[in-house]
Amino acid sequence: MHQQYYNKPLHKLENNIDVTNGLINQRRFDPRKVDVMARKGTIERWILNASLPVGFTIQGAKFVVESQGEHQLQAEELAWKDTVWVKNKTQILVKFDQASSGNYPFLFGVSNLMLEDMGCLGVLMVQ
């Protein structure tokens, strides 16, 4: 399934998750600041790196995991997800099917409540 996207030019985004300090890309969650803008109907390649194993989730989007570490996933392993366990470099293809609004943006980040409270989240706008 993900093979069909390999030949298309994709926007690439790298997210570095600092589990110890509760940061994404060395920043804390700020609900007034949009961290990622995406267009509805597009597909992006996100590369996730975490300092320690942690769950990662995206609201309002779905994705397939392309690879985890050196392991390239096979076609029979692929499924749409909204959460993935990141224990080393993880590469995902994110599809944005739903639009958000300025009043109701989506969030992305860790799925651990203590880390969310520390600010390990980002704001995602899809238009």
Swiss-Prot record:
InterPro entries: Cu-oxidase_C (IPR011706), Cupredoxin (IPR008972). Gene3D superfamilies: Cupredoxins - blue copper proteins. This is Uncharacterized protein HI_0731. Coiled coil: none annotated. It comes from Haemophilus influenzae (strain ATCC 51907 / DSM 11121 / KW20 / Rd). One of its GO terms (molecular function) is copper ion binding. It comes from the Bacteria.
